Amino acid sequence: EIQGVKVDNKFLSILSKKFEKKISLIEDKIYKISKKKFNIASTKQLGEIMYEDLKIASLKKTKKGSFATSASVLEDLAFKGNQFPKLVLEWRQISKLKNTYSDSLQEHINPKTKRVHTSFLLAATTTGRLASSDPNLQNIPIKTEDGKDIRKSFVSEKGNILISADYNQIEMRILADLADVKELKKAFNDQQDIHSL
C-alpha cells in the first residue's frame, strides 16, 4: 500500500488506444449485422436486436421479464455458431479491459510517487484471503493475450524484477496440513486438482 507498484503510463496509453480501435472495429461488425446502431451496453436494446430483429434464438427472458443477454446465454448462442453474440462477448471483454484496467490504472497513478497504491482489506473475505481495492490489483486478467498485455504494464525499478505468485487452492492446502488429512496431502503432492476427485 505504501510503496505502491510502478506502472508504465505510456504503455497503458498505447493499450487504451489499441483497445479503442478494437472496440470500434467490433462495433462496426455488430452494427453491420444488426443493420442499425444501438447501445451495445444496454441489455434491453441488445435483447431487442437479438430476439426481435435478428431472431437469433427463441425468446429467452430472465425471471424479471427482461431479455436474457448474460454472458452464459451469449456463450451458448456463440457456441451454436452465431457470429453476433460472439462479437458482443468480444466487445464486452475488450471494453472491460479498457475501462477497468488500461484507463483506470492511469487514473490511479499517484502524481507524487508515480505509482499505483492499492488498499489491502484484511477482513473482507470469509475465507481469510486478502482483498484489494482502489484499484483491485488481485484480479488483473491473464487468460487472453489482451489481458496479458495489461500485466505487462507493471514494471520494476531499474535493477529489480517483478515476480508473480499464486497460492493455488491455498485454503484446502492449509486444511490438509492442519487437519493432517493424508489423502488430501498426497493429492496436492501429486499435483491433482482436488475439486475433480
Language-model features, listed with the residues they occupy:
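Second-shell residues forming the walls of enzyme active-site clefts
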Residues: K148
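Conserved "right-hand" nucleotidyltransferase catalytic core of DNA-directed polymerases
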Residues: E1-E145, G159-I161, N168-E171
